[in-house]
Amino acid sequence: MNTGLVVFICCVLVAIGVTLHLRKHDMLPIIHKVVDNTTATLVADTVKKKKPVVKRDFNISGSLKDTEGNGVAGVIVSDGFKCVKTDSRGRYKMKRDSLARFIYFSVPAEFEVPTHSATDRTACFYQAVSNKKKVYDFTLRRLPGGKETSYKMIVIGDPQVTNAYSPYYTSPDDNPIKKSDVERFTTQTMADIKQTIKSLPAGTPVYGLSMGDDVQYYGGYNAKLERQIRQALGSSEMRLFSVIGNHDQDGKALYRRKWEENFGPTDFSFDRGDVHYVCINNCFFHRGMSYYSPGELRERQVKWLKQNLALTPKDKKVVLCYHIPFTFGNAPFSKAKPLTNAHEEGHYSSSRLSLLLSLLKQFKGGYELFCGHTHFACNHEINYEGEDVMEHCHAAA
């Protein structure tokens, strides 16, 4: 055999041996290292992508004090889902609902109704919820003479101002005048209310209730409209609360939020004299802008109402305020009851009416039902399950 060929074969065999040896021994750490680095990278990526779960704490607390710093006991505080009462030192605590938008109190009879400002006398008894805020304190101002023994309550239905201009109005000299709805409401309705207040004996406490449909977005959404009607409603000496109506929301979250931004919670209460007023949103939308008529309540609202009334002394009179009549309507919820009166054919009473009456009948001071929506004034009386029930419908203003 050629000597050079032998040397070449030996070199090849040595190379193969070295390679085999390297694969068997030296390459194992290299493979492990690659695998370990890949695993570490995957673990790092997983940790990076998986955000830690932050548990939100919905526990809140606060106090209600008078201007002297004294705690106010026995005041109902709510988040719109549950109600609690302040203790003997005016303190309260609760676990608010994750969907709550306001923390607010039921204005006691011995205290002034707080307002947005000295020139905007719409009621401001609430604070907007913030996820960063855990303490909600309120300061109340005592009425100089204590709880009022008499007062006037001006109730109006459906201001329903729009963004559009109303039809032409005729001036005293027969010239046509074009006015916006807000201007018309301000120069006519509010002017009349101010004149009525002026005619009362000096010092008479005066309060107001709007029964909802403060606005209607006829002609498109207008972000300024709710604020404009609030400023008009708050421009007199009366301290005014408002119910929310169907046109204030029209089944759209944006519209409802704009009303809440200006007037606060939609389900609330307040006391004047020996009367406990409860205002509640009974506009139940089920298909776009369609709503049930008679009015209805959601189950969570029923729970809230039961809690509110359970914390209210039973010697009070209760006035339940809402927009759509509970005693009649012709676009009913499936569980609504047909009215039996011959002249009421095709009309129904709310599926909640029986429950509401059972809750209201607990109060020795009696009860009344206030609504709007109809645009005309009437006292609607029906015989319901053997009982005469009257509902006061307030005319559009």
What do these predicted regions represent?
Residues 75, 81-95:
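Short, acidic Ser/Thr/Gly-rich low-complexity loop/linker segments typical of extracellular
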Residues 58-81:
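Short, ordered, surface-exposed loop/turn motifs in non-cytosolic proteins
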Residues 108-116, 122-132, 219-312, 339-368, ...:
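Extended active-site neighborhood of metal-dependent phosphoesterases/phosphodiesterases
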Residues 28-59, 97, 112-219:
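N-terminal active-site segment of His-dependent metallophosphoesterases
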Residues 309-336:
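Short acidic, glycine-rich surface-loop motifs adjacent to enzyme active sites
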Residues 150-166, 172, 274-286, 319-321, ...:
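Active-site-proximal beta-strand elements of phosphoester/diester hydrolases
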Residues 158, 212-213, 245-246, 323, ...:
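Active-site glycine-centered loops adjacent to acidic/histidine catalytic or metal-binding residues
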Residues 70, 93-102:
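Short Pro-Gly-centered beta-turn/loop motif in secreted/extracellular proteins
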